[in-house]
């Protein structure tokens, strides 16, 4: 079965977005296509229709392929909990908590599973677009590699190598990567792509010719730098793209921030600018403060307490500042957090910010569920949907009211309260990730902020509807930038480009 693998000279060179683009291009050209990444390390995750957890990058790639996201597209997900430890998720379910060394030693046991899953893909699809991780030149990881050249060898896939010119040193990184590969690995590299180029491509051509001569691998295209309303799964990128926008939304950049893709729908609001708060000095006076999710809630709360950000949040709240906490951010806003079993940290209990009258107790069981419901504590007749990923539960105090009434969990009818809102109705929290994807709640909150500013109300758009158009734009950019005839030759697939 035809397959092609996108590897990179480093992390964040654009592998994920290029895979998404190729998936949409192949779909447009009439092929049944599927994305695949054997192992993803990310704190941005998603819950599938059957309640399993996978990386967000493969979710976008699935949508680009016209598919519903499923865990076989990302069978191994690593979620860092500390600098040296992570939660290992296999086929969407928690497998264990592991140190880096422990996981390195256990990787071989997953090879039969990966082979079996890939064989299923070969039977179901015309083309599989595979994404590598980091760089194949991490020679210290070569022996047990299951995500770069080790995977390419396992499934017999050709490789295209991507370099990022925006950071500088792209030719050195391409050359260095190729030099560190074995001869057998080098033979798999069939082309290179330079990504995020700004300027006149003609100026780049002498460099392209020189690097082709040195590495004996053809360049198949130069992709320009662009901005689209698509999520960036790999890193918490700066949001400062609309500095002069009247509505200022600040996001606390927690050390273990997770699911920061929750904020992506806010980018499409025309009069909104988003920025990260990394210290007390840059807190400012935002129209809305968001405290996002965290993979280590207690440690992150202690951190923002230590650096003075918590004091800023409390003072902001006392001035009727608008605060929205999601998952770990919601827990931080409460009265206290307990971790008696050491689920996230060795700290057994810590006092919260005491802004919302809720308390949290962590438990071993991880909740992963898709939900639908209605807002009940803020206003009426607002539908919401999203997904929950957490290992704790909240108890209400007398001064907190539920924010949401959940009516559906993983396709089953239910009726229970979720989230919280304070009596002043300016501070609220929820466990629901993706709650801003729908237009209704986001529009209500944005128009509340606009009213405070004396700005005319606007209608919000459903993020998913906009996303599909943005994927088409992405495909157009990448199609026009690459030698698609060469791409199809690498795939050994007949298409209109081969005629």
Curated annotation (Swiss-Prot):
List residues of the GATase cobBQ-type domain.
246-441
Q: Which GO terms describe its molecular function?
A: ABC-type vitamin B12 transporter activity; catalytic activity
InterPro entries from the UniProt entry: Class_I_gatase-like (IPR029062), CobQ/CobB/MinD/ParA_Nub-bd_dom (IPR002586), CobQ_GATase1 (IPR033949), CobQ_N (IPR047045), CobQ_synth (IPR004459), GATase_3 (IPR011698), P-loop_NTPase (IPR027417)
Q: Which residues form the active site?
A: 327, 433
Which Gene Ontology BP annotations are present?
Answer: cobalamin biosynthetic process
Pathway assignment reads: Cofactor biosynthesis; adenosylcobalamin biosynthesis
The record ties this protein, via Gene3D superfamilies, to:
3.40.50.880, P-loop containing nucleotide triphosphate hydrolases
Which HAMAP family does the entry mention? CobQ
Q: What is this protein called?
A: Cobyric acid synthase
């Amino acid at each position: 079965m035809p397959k092609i693998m996108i590897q990179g000279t480093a992390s964040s060179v654009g592998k994920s977005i290029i895979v998404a683009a190729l998936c949409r291009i192949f779909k447009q050209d009439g092929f049944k296509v599927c994305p695949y990444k054997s192992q993803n390390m990310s704190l941005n995750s998603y819950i599938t229709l059957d309640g399993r957890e996978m990386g967000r990058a493969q979710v976008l790639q699935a949508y680009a392929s016209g598919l519903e996201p499923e865990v076989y597209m990302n069978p191994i997900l690593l979620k860092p909990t500390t600098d040296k430890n992570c939660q290992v998720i296999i086929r969407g379910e928690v497998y264990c908590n592991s140190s880096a060394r422990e996981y390195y030693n256990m990787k071989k046991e997953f090879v039969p599973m990966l082979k079996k899953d890939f064989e299923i893909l070969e039977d179901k699809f015309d083309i599989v677009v595979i994404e590598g991780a980091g760089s194949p030149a991490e020679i210290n990881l070569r022996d047990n590699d299951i995500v770069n050249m080790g995977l390419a060898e396992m499934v017999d896939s050709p490789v295209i190598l991507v370099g990022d010119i925006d950071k500088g040193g792209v030719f050195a990184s391409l050359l260095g990567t190729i030099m560190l590969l074995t001869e057998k690995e080098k033979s798999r590299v069939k082309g290179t792509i330079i990504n995020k180029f700004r300027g006149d491509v003609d100026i780049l051509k002498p460099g392209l010719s020189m690097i082709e001569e040195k590495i004996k691998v053809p360049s198949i295209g130069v992709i320009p730098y662009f901005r689209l309303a698509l999520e960036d799964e790999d890193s918490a990128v700066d949001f400062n793209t609309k500095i002069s926008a009247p509505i200022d939304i600040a996001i606390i950049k927690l050390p273990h921030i997770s699911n920061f893709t929750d904020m992506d729908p806010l980018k499409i609001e025309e009069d909104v600018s988003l920025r990260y708060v990394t210290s007390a000095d840059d807190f400012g006076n935002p129209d809305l403060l968001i405290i996002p999710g965290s993979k280590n809630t207690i440690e992150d709360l202690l951190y923002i307490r230590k650096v003075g950000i918590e004091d800023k949040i409390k003072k902001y709240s006392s001035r009727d500042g608008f605060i929205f906490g999601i998952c770990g951010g919601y827990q931080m806003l409460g009265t206290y957090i307990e971790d008696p079993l050491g689920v996230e940290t060795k700290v057994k209990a810590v006092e919260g910010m005491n802004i919302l009258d809720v308390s949290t107790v962590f438990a071993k069981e991880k909740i992963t569920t898709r939900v639908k419901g209605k807002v009940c504590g803020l206003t009426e007749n607002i539908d919401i949907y999203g997904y929950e990923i957490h290992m704790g539960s909240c108890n209400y105090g007398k001064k907190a009211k539920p924010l949401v009434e959940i009516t559906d969990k993983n396709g089953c009818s239910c009726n229970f309260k979720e989230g919280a809102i304070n009596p002043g109705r300016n501070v609220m929290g929820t466990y629901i990730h993706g709650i801003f994807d729908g237009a209704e709640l986001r529009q209500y909150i944005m128009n509340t902020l606009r009213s405070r500013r004396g700005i005319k109300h606007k209608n919000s758009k459903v993020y998913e509807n906009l996303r599909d158009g943005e994927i088409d734009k992405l495909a157009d950019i990448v199609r026009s930038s690459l030698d698609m005839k060469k791409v199809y030759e690498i795939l050994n697939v007949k298409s209109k480009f081969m005629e």
